[in-house]
Amino acid sequence: IALGIGSVLYANNELKLLTDSLRRVIDEKHVFVKEKEDRINRIKCMLRSPGLTLEGEYRINLRLYNEYKKFHIDSAIHYVDRNIEISRQLNRPYFTNQSSLHLSLLYSMCGRFREAEIILKSIKTSELPRDLLINYYQTYSSFWGHYSISVANNLYGKQQSAYQDSLFALIDHTSWDYRMSQASYYIWRDTLKSKEIFKELLDIEEVGTPNYAMITHSYSRLCHHQKKYDEEKKY
């Protein structure tokens, strides 16, 4: 009985710590938002530079996409759409494929799965250089990950694992992306291994960063798969 009470007290204390941490993040949200908006405005000022070339605009829009994609998806889509136009004007297949992958990822993130998949199916993988091929497999893996959550069907999570197999053959095995993909891959194959990797990533990642949010989001999927709904809610 004492052991059971101790476990409950520990769980309650852990939940309180998480709640307090979340409350602090919410209280400081306006600071983070202000810093983000200031950084975005500085980048936007570069679009007014005299003599700016189309390629220069493309690269500035790319920075704005990266700033906006986890902050304001509609704005990120706006700059990616513009980059697709630029890539066609410049007749640069690399830019076209890069921007198309970015657009597919954004569509997956906001639930526009049909449009996201149409884009992915239109890309000829045989024509992609190594870096874009890695991006392609990452984007397709993310597509199935988001889709499996939306329909609560583990079958689609297994399809995500199939694309991760291809990704593993290309990606740097010492990178954060590799470890993150590995943890997600094992959700459907070895839950203990998956949990071990997620815990390692959480231990070294700073709370509140975009990477931390990605880890907790994916870890919550593992909890859901294991039917540990209280732990899923916590993350």
Model segments located where?
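Bacterial N-terminal signal peptides
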Residues: I1-G6
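A "functional boundary" signal
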Residues: S7-Y235
